[in-house]
C-alpha cells in the first residue's frame, strides 16, 4: 500500500485492485439509502476529485464519515477499482477513512457554497485556492513557469537572479517603491532640509525594482544568453484589470542579437509554452473553455499555428488612420498605441499575432537603440488577438555617446548609471531583449479577465492583505 496523488488514480497510473492511500480535502459527500456514502476527495494534483465509496460497515462510519462536510481533510485507504458510474474511470473502495481535520462550523465555512463571485474570492484569498477556478489557475501558472524555464534551458540560456532592491530606475518613469529603514517620525535632514539618505540602510535612496533588465544586460555581456524571472514592482495608482503593484516578469537578454532576432525568440517561446500547457494541463484547460472562456483552448491552438505578422509602427498608424473605425483614443504618429488600437491590428486587420517595430523615440525608454532616422528606436511589441500587447522589447543602445544623449534628453543623471555605461566602454556589443508580464500571459491562457485572479495574493493600491 502506498500514498499516491489523486491524479495518479484518475489518470490510470495505478493498477486496478491496488491498495492505495490518498490524502486530501472533501469537496462533497452524498449518502445513499443503501448505507453507502460517496466522498469526492481532491488534493490539488489535478482538476477532478476522486470518488471514495464508503460502506456503513466501517467502524467510524456513523461517528466520522456521516459528519464530513466540504473542506474537511481526510486520509482514505482502499482498493482502486473501475468506476461503474459516469464521469471517471476509476474510484476507490474505501477500507479505512481517517479524519485529519474538521471544519469547525460548516455553516460559516467561507468556501461552503458551490459557486462564489470572483470579487468575493479576493476577500478570502487564503482559502480561494480550494476552488476549482483558482486551483486550476495555480496549476496552469506552475506549468507555464516550468515551460519557460525548460524553453530557455533548451535554447542555451542561463537563468540570472537579479536584485529586487536597486538604486536605478530602469524605465525612467519614477513610479517606484522606496526601501528605507529611516524612522518616519524622525527623518534625518541635510543642510538643504531634504531627507538625508546617507543615514539610511544602504547609504543612498533605494527602491524595489521595476525590472531586472539593466542588471540582466551585464550578464548577457558575459554569458551571451541569459534570462531573469522574478517579481517586479510598480507604484502606479492604477485600478485596472491589467495592473498589479507586484507582478512577475520574464526578461531574456541576448548578446550579438538584433531586433529581428528577439522577435523570432519571442514567437518561438510563446508557441512552446502554449503547446506545453495544452498538453500538460488538458483537464484544467478544458475547465477554462467550459466555464471561463469558450475560446481558451482554440485561441492557443490558432496562436501555435499562426505565422506572426510584422509591421512598422509608422505603417500601423497609417492602417489605423485609414480603417474607418472611430477609436476612443485618437490615432496619430507619435501616440503610444492603446489596447483598442493593438487589438484592432491583431484581431481585425492581420487576424494573427503581430510584431510592431520601430516606435517613436519619445514614447520609449532611454536604453532603446536609436535608428538611423533619428526619430525612431529599435523597439518592438508583440500583440496577441484577444489581449493586445503581451511582450515588449528592443535592441539596446550599445553606443555610449548616443546613450548619454538619450539620458540627457530624458532628464536622467548619467552618473547614476555609471556601471550600465561601463558595458559600452569595455567591449560593447549589440544586444537585445524583451519583457513578458507573467500574469498577463496567464490571463491570456486561461481567459481569466483580471490579473488579480492569476497571482496568489494580489498587491494593488490600498490592498496588501494576507
UniProtKB/Swiss-Prot annotation:
Keywords: Aminoacyl-tRNA synthetase, ATP-binding, Cytoplasm, Ligase, Nucleotide-binding, Protein biosynthesis. It is found in: Cytoplasm. It catalyses: tRNA(Asn) + L-asparagine + ATP = L-asparaginyl-tRNA(Asn) + AMP + diphosphate + H(+). GO terms for biological process: asparaginyl-tRNA aminoacylation. GO terms for cellular component: cytoplasm. Its EC number is 6.1.1.22. It comes from the Bacteria. One of its GO terms (molecular function) is asparagine-tRNA ligase activity. Its main location: cytoplasm. The keyword Nucleotide-binding applies. Homodimer. Belongs to the class-II aminoacyl-tRNA synthetase family. PANTHER family: ASPARAGINE--TRNA LIGASE, MITOCHONDRIAL-RELATED, ASPARTYL/LYSYL-TRNA SYNTHETASE. This is Asparagine--tRNA ligase. It comes from Shigella dysenteriae serotype 1 (strain Sd197). The lineage of its organism: Bacteria, Pseudomonadati, Pseudomonadota, Gammaproteobacteria, Enterobacterales.
Amino acid at each position: 500500500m502506498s500514498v499516491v496523488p489523486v491524479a495518479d488514480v484518475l489518470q490510470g497510473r495505478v493498477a486496478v485492485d491496488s491498495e492505495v492511500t490518498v490524502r486530501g480535502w472533501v469537496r462533497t459527500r452524498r449518502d445513499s439509502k443503501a448505507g453507502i456514502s460517496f466522498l469526492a476527495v481532491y488534493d490539488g494534483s489535478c482538476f477532478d476529485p476522486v470518488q471514495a465509496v464508503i460502506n456503513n460497515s466501517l467502524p467510524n462510519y456513523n461517528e466520522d464519515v456521516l459528519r464530513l462536510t466540504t473542506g474537511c481533510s481526510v486520509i482514505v485507504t482502499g482498493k482502486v477499482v473501475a468506476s461503474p458510474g459516469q464521469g471517471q474511470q476509476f474510484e476507490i473502495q474505501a477500507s479505512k477513512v481517517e479524519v485529519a481535520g474538521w471544519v469547525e462550523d460548516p455553516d460559516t465555512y467561507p468556501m461552503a457554497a458551490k459557486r462564489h463571485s470572483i470579487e468575493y474570492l479576493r476577500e478570502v484569498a487564503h482559502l480561494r485556492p480550494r476552488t476549482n477556478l483558482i486551483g486550476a489557475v495555480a496549476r496552469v501558472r506552475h506549468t507555464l513557469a516550468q515551460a519557460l524555464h525548460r524553453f530557455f534551458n533548451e535554447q542555451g540560456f542561463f537563468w540570472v537572479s537579479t536584485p529586487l532592491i536597486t538604486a536605478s530606475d530602469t524605465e525612467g518613469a519614477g513610479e517606484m517603491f522606496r526601501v528605507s529603514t529611516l524612522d518616519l517620525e524622525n527623518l534625518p535632514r541635510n543642510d538643504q532640509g531634504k531627507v538625508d539618505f546617507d543615514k539610511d540602510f544602504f547609504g543612498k535612496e533605494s527602491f524595489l525594482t521595476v525590472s531586472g533588465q539593466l542588471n540582466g544586460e551585464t550578464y548577457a555581456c558575459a554569458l551571451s544568453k541569459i534570462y531573469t524571472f522574478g517579481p517586479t514592482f510598480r507604484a502606479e495608482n492604477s485600478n485596472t484589470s491589467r495592473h498589479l503593484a507586484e507582478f512577475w516578469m520574464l526578461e531574456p537578454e541576448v548578446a550579438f542579437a538584433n531586433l529581428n532576432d528577439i522577435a523570432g525568440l519571442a514567437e518561438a517561446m510563446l508557441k512552446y509554452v502554449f503547446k506545453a500547457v495544452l498538453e500538460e494541463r488538458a483537464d484544467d484547460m478544458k475547465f477554462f473553455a467550459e466555464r471561463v472562456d469558450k475560446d481558451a483552448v482554440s485561441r492557443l491552438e490558432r496562436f501555435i499555428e499562426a505565422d506572426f505578422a510584422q509591421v512598422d509602427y509608422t505603417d500601423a498608424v497609417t492602417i489605423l488612420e485609414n480603417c474607418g473605425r472611430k477609436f476612443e483614443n485618437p490615432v496619430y504618429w507619435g501616440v503610444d498605441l492603446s489596447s483598442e488600437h493593438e487589438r484592432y491590428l491583431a484581431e481585425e486587420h492581420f487576424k494573427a499575432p503581430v510584431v510592431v517595430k520601430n516606435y517613436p523615440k519619445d514614447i520609449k525608454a532611454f536604453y532603446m537603440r536609436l535608428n538611423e532616422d533619428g526619430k525612431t528606436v529599435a523597439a518592438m511589441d508583440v500583440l496577441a488577438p484577444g489581449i493586445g500587447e503581451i511582450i515588449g522589447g528592443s535592441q539596446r543602445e550599445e553606443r555610449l555617446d548616443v546613450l548619454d544623449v538619450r539620458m540627457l534628453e530624458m532628464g536622467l543623471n548619467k552618473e547614476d548609471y555609471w556601471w550600465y555605461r561601463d558595458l559600452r566602454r569595455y567591449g560593447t556589443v549589440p544586444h537585445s531583449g524583451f519583457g513578458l508580464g507573467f500574469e498577463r500571459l496567464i490571463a491570456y491562457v486561461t481567459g481569466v479577465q483580471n490579473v488579480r485572479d492569476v497571482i496568489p495574493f494580489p498587491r494593488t493600491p490600498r490592498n496588501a492583505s494576507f
